[in-house]
């Protein structure tokens, strides 16, 4: 009995997966992007850009590398192994379970209810 239930459950999951993946409309990447971003990406039929520099974005000086330490000040994130970690912002709220987890728990609970 349990084997047929697992087969039915597997078929239900496969059906849901196929229906969800095929129901999403297929929109090209360029249609999804905003007009400000689309010109920055190459289109599928374009030739390679020339090296005249007209298509490049001018760069600005980068900020200093945080990995290089000159030793003039202690690292504020470093703490000894026996000390408590530094107090920082509160932890992010816990994430909600995904729809798949909720669907699985609903199917299992309803199947166990029907088995009674």
From Swiss-Prot:
<protein>
    <recommendedName>
        <fullName>Classical arabinogalactan protein 25</fullName>
    </recommendedName>
</protein>
<feature type="lipid moiety-binding region" description="GPI-anchor amidated serine">
    <location>
        <position position="89"/>
    </location>
</feature>
<keyword id="KW-0325">Glycoprotein</keyword>
<comment type="similarity">
    <text>Belongs to the classical AGP family.</text>
</comment>
<comment type="function">
    <text>Proteoglycan that seems to be implicated in diverse developmental roles such as differentiation, cell-cell recognition, embryogenesis and programmed cell death.</text>
</comment>
<feature type="compositionally biased region" description="Low complexity">
    <location>
        <begin position="69"/>
        <end position="82"/>
    </location>
</feature>
<feature type="propeptide" description="Removed in mature form">
    <location>
        <begin position="90"/>
        <end position="116"/>
    </location>
</feature>
<dbReference type="GO" id="GO:0005886">
    <property type="term" value="C:plasma membrane"/>
</dbReference>
<keyword id="KW-0472">Membrane</keyword>
<keyword id="KW-0449">Lipoprotein</keyword>
<feature type="signal peptide">
    <location>
        <begin position="1"/>
        <end position="28"/>
    </location>
</feature>
<keyword id="KW-0732">Signal</keyword>
<keyword id="KW-0336">GPI-anchor</keyword>
<feature type="compositionally biased region" description="Pro residues">
    <location>
        <begin position="83"/>
        <end position="95"/>
    </location>
</feature>
<feature type="compositionally biased region" description="Low complexity">
    <location>
        <begin position="50"/>
        <end position="59"/>
    </location>
</feature>
<feature type="region of interest" description="Disordered">
    <location>
        <begin position="40"/>
        <end position="95"/>
    </location>
</feature>
<keyword id="KW-1003">Cell membrane</keyword>
<dbReference type="InterPro" id="IPR039346">
    <property type="entry name" value="AGP25/26"/>
</dbReference>
<dbReference type="GO" id="GO:0098552">
    <property type="term" value="C:side of membrane"/>
</dbReference>
<keyword id="KW-0654">Proteoglycan</keyword>
């Amino acid at each position: 009995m349990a084997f047929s239930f697992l087969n039915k459950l597997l078929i239900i999951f496969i059906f849901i997966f196929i229906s969800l993946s095929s129901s999403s409309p297929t929109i090209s990447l360029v249609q999804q992007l905003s007009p400000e971003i689309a010109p920055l990406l190459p289109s599928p039929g374009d030739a390679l850009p020339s090296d005249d520099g007209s298509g490049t974005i001018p760069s600005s000086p980068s900020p200093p590398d945080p990995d290089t330490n000159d030793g003039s000040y202690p690292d504020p994130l470093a703490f000894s192994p026996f000390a408590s970690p530094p107090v920082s912002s509160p932890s992010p709220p816990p994430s909600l379970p995904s729809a798949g987890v909720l669907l699985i728990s609903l199917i299992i609970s309803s199947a166990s209810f029907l088995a009674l």
